[in-house]
C-alpha cells in the first residue's frame, strides 16, 4: 500500500512574521506546492515585495502588529475576502533578546509577550471560527526548544515560548474532536534575522551550526500534508551539529 500525503494545492494558510526567516520560507514552499498565503508582519514594504514575488493570485498581505486584536481580525477578514476560507494558521511572529532578567526594560518584556504569545492567541481567535464551521483545519504554532528548557540568558523569551507550549496543549485537547489539528514546531537555533539581531553576526561560528529557515518550513508543510486521520502534536528540530 502506498502512503499518500495530502495535496495542499489551493489550501489557504495564514502566516505571521512572514517577511523573513521561517515565515518567508514557509510562504515560498507553500506557494510552490499550489497553496495560497495570507501574510502578516509589521513592515509593509517588505510584505509588498514578497507578494509581488509570489504573485497576487497566490498571496495577500496585512501589515501590522499581530498582537493587536484589531489587526488579527483584519488578517482573518482579508483572508476570507481574498480566498474565501482559511485552512491553516501558522503563528510564527516572534522577537527575543538575551540577557539577565534584570537587564530588560519594561517595554522589552511587554513586547516579547505581546508578539510571541498574545499575537499567537489573537490570530488563532480571529481565524479559528472559519475552520470550526467546516470541521477541518490546522493550527501550527512555531515556538522554540526554549519553551521546554530556556537558557540562563533567555528567561523572558523562554517564558513566552513556554506559554505557547501550554496554549498548544490546551488547544489540542479542546479542538481535536472538532476536526482541527494543533501542532507545535519547536526549532533549536535557526539562522534568521531574529538570531542575528539577538547578538550574533552573519559570520559567527554559532550560526554555522544552526538550522536553516527552509528546514523548519519543510516541517510546517509536512504537517499540513499528513492524512487527516493523523494528529502529530510536538515536533522538535535540531541540526546535526547542535547539542541537544
Which sequence ranges carry the predicted segments?
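Substrate-binding pocket helix/loop in short-chain dehydrogenase/reductase
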Residues: 100-101, 108-110
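The beta1-alpha1 cofactor-binding region of Rossmann-like NAD(H)/NADP(H)-dependent oxidoreductases
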Residues: 44, 63-75, 106
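C-terminal helical subdomain
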Residues: 180, 184-185, 204-243
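Residue(s) in the substrate-gating loop at a strand-loop-helix junction
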Residues: 144
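Active-site helix of classical SDR
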Residues: 124, 160
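Conserved glycine-rich cofactor-binding loop
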Residues: 19-20
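Conserved glycine-rich Rossmann-like NAD(P)H-binding loop of the short-chain dehydrogenase/reductase
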Residues: 33-50
